[in-house]
Curated annotation (Swiss-Prot):
PROSITE patterns for the chain: RIBOSOMAL_S17
Pfam families: Ribosomal_S17 (PF00366)
Top-level lineage group: Bacteria
RNA-binding as UniProt keyword: yes
A GO term, aspect molecular function: structural constituent of ribosome
GO biological process, one term: translation
Keyword terms of this UniProt record: Ribonucleoprotein, Ribosomal protein, RNA-binding, rRNA-binding
Species this protein is from: Idiomarina loihiensis (strain ATCC BAA-735 / DSM 15497 / L2-TR)
Annotated Gene Ontology cellular component terms: cytosolic small ribosomal subunit
Disulfide bond annotation, renumbered to this chain: none
Family: Belongs to the universal ribosomal protein uS17 family.
Subunit (UniProt): Part of the 30S ribosomal subunit.
Name under which the protein is recorded: Small ribosomal subunit protein uS17
Entry's transmembrane regions: none
Length: 87
């Protein structure tokens, strides 16, 4: 048997990069309403570690779960999927 754990990853959009080495990522998921059956978009914000401060607000990123790095930060930047266009 393998002792390797499955690493959780999330894809979302960066909504804040104001903190040093930390980004806030908004992750959207669709859930079905228990009574009406309509699909609703729910948003969860997670703080992720960005060692080189390379991500800007509006970028689409993939983050992976890691050991707790602070009180609120348990995710780290895995890769940048899409850069936001600079206007």
């Amino acid at each position: 048997m393998t002792d390797e754990k499955r690493v959780r990853t999330l894809q979302g959009k960066v909504v804040s990069d104001k903190m040093d080495k930390t980004i806030t990522v908004a992750v959207e998921r669709r859930v079905k309403h228990p009574v009406y059956g309509k699909y609703i978009t729910r948003t969860t914000k997670v703080h992720a570690h960005d060692e080189e401060n390379q991500v800007k607000a509006g970028d689409t990123v993939i983050v992976r779960e890691c050991r707790p790095l602070s009180k609120n930060k348990s995710w780290t930047l895995e890769e940048i999927v899409d850069r936001a266009t600079v206007v």
